[in-house]
């Protein structure tokens, strides 16, 4: 089977930066090292960190004194970081710089009197962190969902870094017709936009698509949605163990894309499995 791999498949710059930082901290510290939440949304990568002795906690309350805490790629809720500082814990900030941008915008624009609207998943760690930096209540609009009525004269719209651009545009358009002043700040990561454009192009050129990445990874799920809209024979898997040969009957070329948190070795494992098909 011929396999066409998307140019952008695998770790983005921000994730690779955080992964390298975790490995460096694990190698240099004798004291316990934990990440505040899964460092990235990929079970295989998290398992590798565990083998290095890096644990995972859900909150600072679970951390023992003397432990080094690494903030994950998606950032953390501001109050949790304040608790860590108050306890004198060593904190290594692995937050992606692109995630820090919507955090800063939420804080700055809320101080300027704007009601903050975030296009994204309210349950995602990144959005929880962004909300914590706003100094006023926020409204989170789920991609594809209705835009609620907001009682505010000034509205500022930002987005989850992995949001689909068309959804951000849709929400801004709806709000622009309702409010006298709407400020739109595009906080979607450039890598996300490039990866999604790459996925669209790939899906239009192949007989089937496999998107590789954690089932809990928002950007990977979005890639699968984008590909499936163009090529119905699209599957989202975490590893080659989930693949079935019958899926690819009649296919000559299979496209392979992967989320920003998918390790290279996982992508290669899926590619090797596909190439072995006859």
Curated annotation (Swiss-Prot):
One of its GO terms (biological process) is dimethylallyl diphosphate biosynthetic process. It comes from the Bacteria. The active site is at residue 126. Its cofactor is [4Fe-4S] cluster. It catalyses: isopentenyl diphosphate + 2 oxidized [2Fe-2S]-[ferredoxin] + H2O = (2E)-4-hydroxy-3-methylbut-2-enyl diphosphate + 2 reduced [2Fe-2S]-[ferredoxin] + 2 H(+); dimethylallyl diphosphate + 2 oxidized [2Fe-2S]-[ferredoxin] + H2O = (2E)-4-hydroxy-3-methylbut-2-enyl diphosphate + 2 reduced [2Fe-2S]-[ferredoxin] + 2 H(+). Gene3D superfamilies: 3.40.50.11270, 4-hydroxy-3-methylbut-2-enyl diphosphate reductase, catalytic domain. Coiled coil: none annotated. Binds 1 [4Fe-4S] cluster per subunit. Dimethylallyl diphosphate binds at residues 41, 74, 124, 217, 219, 261. GO terms for molecular function: 4 iron, 4 sulfur cluster binding; 4-hydroxy-3-methylbut-2-enyl diphosphate reductase activity; metal ion binding. (2E)-4-hydroxy-3-methylbut-2-enyl diphosphate binds at residues 41, 74, 124, 161, 217, 219, 261. [4Fe-4S] cluster binds at residues 12, 96, 189. Its EC number is 1.17.7.4. Keywords: 4Fe-4S, Iron, Iron-sulfur, Isoprene biosynthesis, Metal-binding, Oxidoreductase. Pathway: Isoprenoid biosynthesis; dimethylallyl diphosphate biosynthesis; dimethylallyl diphosphate from (2E)-4-hydroxy-3-methylbutenyl diphosphate: step 1/1; Isoprenoid biosynthesis; isopentenyl diphosphate biosynthesis via DXP pathway; isopentenyl diphosphate from 1-deoxy-D-xylulose 5-phosphate: step 6/6. Isopentenyl diphosphate binds at residues 41, 74, 124, 217, 219, 261. Belongs to the IspH family. Catalyzes the conversion of 1-hydroxy-2-methyl-2-(E)-butenyl 4-diphosphate (HMBPP) into a mixture of isopentenyl diphosphate (IPP) and dimethylallyl diphosphate (DMAPP). Acts in the terminal step of the DOXP/MEP pathway for isoprenoid precursor biosynthesis. This is 4-hydroxy-3-methylbut-2-enyl diphosphate reductase. The lineage of its organism: Bacteria, Pseudomonadati, Myxococcota, Myxococcia, Myxococcales. The gene is ispH.
